[in-house]
Every structure is written in C-alpha cells, then in structure tokens.
Swiss-Prot record:
It holds the Pfam family SPOUT_MTase. Its main location: cytoplasm. Its EC number is 2.1.1.177. Disulfide bonds: none annotated. Specifically methylates the pseudouridine at position 1915 (m3Psi1915) in 23S rRNA. S-adenosyl-L-methionine binds at residues 72, 103, 122-127. Belongs to the RNA methyltransferase RlmH family. It is found in: Cytoplasm. It comes from the Bacteria. It comes from Escherichia fergusonii (strain ATCC 35469 / DSM 13698 / CCUG 18766 / IAM 14443 / JCM 21226 / LMG 7866 / NBRC 102419 / NCTC 12128 / CDC 0568-73). This is Ribosomal RNA large subunit methyltransferase H. Homodimer. It is an enzyme of class 2 (transferase). The keyword Transport does not apply.
C-alpha cells in the first residue's frame, strides 16, 4: 500500500519542507509515502472562488485516481493515535493505495468531499494548511510505528 498526501499549495516555508521531509524519509519501503502538490488557484478581489475550488478539486481527484480517498476536514471524524493505527491496518488489508486530501484556503471542493470514503479531523481548530502536512506525516508515521511495534511510539 502506498500513502499519498495530495495538498493544495506549492510554495511552503522551509520549516514545513524540513518537517515533512523528516517523516517522509522514515517511512519503510513497503509503505511509501509521497506528496503531490496541486497549484493553488489565483485568488484576488474578484476571484471566482467556487470555480477555483472546482478546479483544485478536479486536480486533486485526478491525482488520487482510484485510490481510497480520505479528506482532512474539520467536520471529519477525530481519530486518536491508536484509532489511526487501526485505520492504517484496515487500509493495508483493503489493499488499495490511500490518498489523503488537504484543501486550500477555502477548504475542499464539494466533489472531493463527495468522493471521500472517510473524512479525518485533526482538530476542531482551524489549522494552517502547511502545518497540517507536517502533522499528518508525523501522525501516520506514529500510527505505522504502533502497527509494527517500532519504539517511536511509547504508551
């Protein structure tokens, strides 16, 4: 199974690149984790936000292909670390690759939300999307460490 993070935005601060890459390199070869960046639509005073969301959503869904789609969204289901580890195990048993979608400043398109098999809420707080990349990578790595009895996670 391959994990794929599909995120809107291409120019991240150095600390995001550093943090995300740190966890990316830790994933084992039998569970590769990749980042697919979707260029953010141009937003301005007279921007058609609905159309921008639609276009970003189309690109995200195209990147995900036939993968299981999990959206990152405030109204999603909050998983604690053991629950995320259990989800990771279920995803592995399912056999399909998994695409986790992070929207842009206005969130995810209705099409992305409709295509999602699951929706995961990291927090009831609104989090900056660059930070979410790092949180998701660390959380998934920690979940993997639980499923393999790796010493990274301690009870």
């Amino acid at each position: 199974m391959k994990l794929q993070l599909v995120a809107v935005g291409t120019k991240m601060p150095a600390w995001v690149e550093t943090g995300f890459t740190e966890y990316l390199r830790r994933f084992p070869k039998d569970m590769p984790f990749e980042l697919v960046e979707i260029p953010a639509g141009k937003r301005g005073k007279n921007a058609d936000i609905k159309r921008i969301l639609e276009k970003e959503g189309e690109q995200m869904l195209a990147a995900a292909g036939k993968n299981r789609i999990v959206t990152l969204d405030i109204p999603g289901k909050p998983w604690d670390t053991p629950q995320l580890a259990a989800e990771l195990e279920r995803w592995k048993l399912d056999g399909r690759d998994v695409s986790l979608l992070i929207g842009g400043p206005e969130g995810l398109s209705p099409a992305c939300k409709a295509a999602a098999e699951q929706s995961w809420s990291l927090s009831a707080l609104t989090l900056p999307h660059p930070l979410v990349r790092v949180l998701v990578a660390e959380s998934l790595y920690r979940a993997w460490s639980i499923t393999t009895n790796h010493p990274y996670h301690r009870e």
